[in-house]
Amino acid sequence: MYLYTLILLFLASANVNAYANPGACSGNCWTHDPGLYQRKSDGKYFRFATGGGIHIASADSLEGPWTDDGYVLPSGSIIDLDGKTNLWAPDLHYHDGTYYLYYAVSSLGSQNSATGVATSKTMEAGSWTDHGTTGIESTPSSPYNTIDANWIAVGGTQYVNFGSYWNNLFQVEMENGLKVKSGATPHQIAYNASGIHRQEAAFMFERNNYFYLTFSGGIALGYNDTWPAPGEEYFIAVCRSTSATGGFVDKNGVSCLNSGGSLLLSSHDFVYGPGGQGILQDSSKGFVLYYHYADTRIGKAVEDYQFGWNQLKWENDWPSV
């Protein structure tokens, strides 16, 4: 909890020039909790976002121009829970010739949640098949909330990271891209002990024999009603480990299970509350951090959020923006 307080104090006093501004974006630049993937066949970019049946946008470059292509699941999910027509937090991966998209079915403040999955050969609108629940589900008696799924494969083993608030971030082994492994039990990989445990949006990736766990912390929404106190808005942090299944620590060696986390990106210049992040291994730009943010020159409502991206820089195997 003490370390998490230090992060908030640093956010409130950070040099506004410490970060590079987001890369250029033209066309449809709205997004929320983006998922981003580059098609294997031709390098075209597809960007997915929270809302409706998961928004789809596409472009031939990260800079755009981005076009609005419709929805992954125009009629919503076949999972019968509140929120089935307003899906959240898309996560993309490619495996054995198929694109997989994980999505969350839930409602604000509820643990009645499930992680669903849809598949496609192209990522184009109209090409997606909904397979319903992965078996990653939660109820009010669960220690976690099964939203914000993120897939990673290590050798021949697949895992999904998930979680938001409650006891924060968990991981579970998958049988395949569609279903959780029979008998698998989720285990905790990160926890923020302070306040109401504002931690979510796990995204894990591998580089140079390290596994990096990025996540979002702080207040994610409601900026159109009240600005949070300086430093309490959304931000992105990172820990790393030599194992994908645990042992994550920050730059100071503090465990991510004990409120650890090194700041990766926070508010600066016109960028406010960056979060809902992921990492794209771009064919030409290398590791790219992508996220949504409120542009203070445009507006602070969710409807005004913008697509942000930055190429990561590296020092001593730690990323920076």
From Swiss-Prot:
Endo-1,5-alpha-L-arabinanase involved in degradation of pectin. Its preferred substrate is linear 1,5-alpha-L-arabinan. The gene is abnC. GO terms for biological process: arabinan catabolic process; xylan catabolic process. Pathway: Glycan metabolism; L-arabinan degradation. CDD domains: GH43_AnAbnA-like. It is an enzyme of class 3 (hydrolase). It catalyses: Endohydrolysis of (1->5)-alpha-arabinofuranosidic linkages in (1->5)-arabinans. Its main location: secreted. Pfam families: Glyco_hydro_43. Belongs to the glycosyl hydrolase 43 family. Glycans are attached at residues 192, 224. It comes from Aspergillus fumigatus (strain ATCC MYA-4609 / CBS 101355 / FGSC A1100 / Af293). It comes from the Eukaryota. This is Probable arabinan endo-1,5-alpha-L-arabinosidase C. Keywords: Carbohydrate metabolism, Glycoprotein, Glycosidase, Hydrolase, Polysaccharide degradation, Secreted, Signal, Xylan degradation. Residues 1-18 form the signal peptide. It is found in: Secreted.
